[in-house]
Structures are given as structure tokens and as C-alpha cells.
Amino acid sequence: MTEKSVFIGQKPVRNYVLACLTSLYSGSNKVVVKARGRAICRAVDTVEMLRRSMKDLQLENIMLSTEEVAREQGRKSNVSAIEITLSKP
């Protein structure tokens, strides 16, 4: 079973939906949508659009975490992260 990861950033949601669909139709059985910080809402939108377009797509796992990121002047801050695993039967 192959698994591909799609990292969500600042591009439009449709670009990420297309990337996920391409990997699913090119032989991958699983897609992991990953995002941090403000991109989390864009990741959730991507997954919902995928679930609407592919009725047989299954939500396998959702993992939430907090990552420590180094900022300017040596400060550290916590950033939320999400990983959503989708699979097709």
C-alpha cells in the first residue's frame, strides 16, 4: 500500500485537491494531508472537497499535534499541526 503526503500552504484549495486526486488516481491507496498553523483550515477544506468529489473515500485517521518553531531572536513558539489520512477502498 503506497502513501503520499500533500503539504498544505498558501495556494488555493483547488490546487491541493487536484494534487490529492492525482496521487489517488495514479496508484496511491492513501493520501496524508498535512498542515501547520493558519493552513489547518485550508487542509480541512481540502479534505471536505475531496470527500464530496469521491464518495467512496474513507477518513482513516486525524492526528493533532503541537510543534515548537524557532522564531527571530532565538525565541520559540508553539504551532498547531494536523495530519489527516484518507484512503480509498
Residue ranges, per PLM feature:
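Residues that cap or initiate secondary-structure elements
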Residues: 12-14, 39, 68
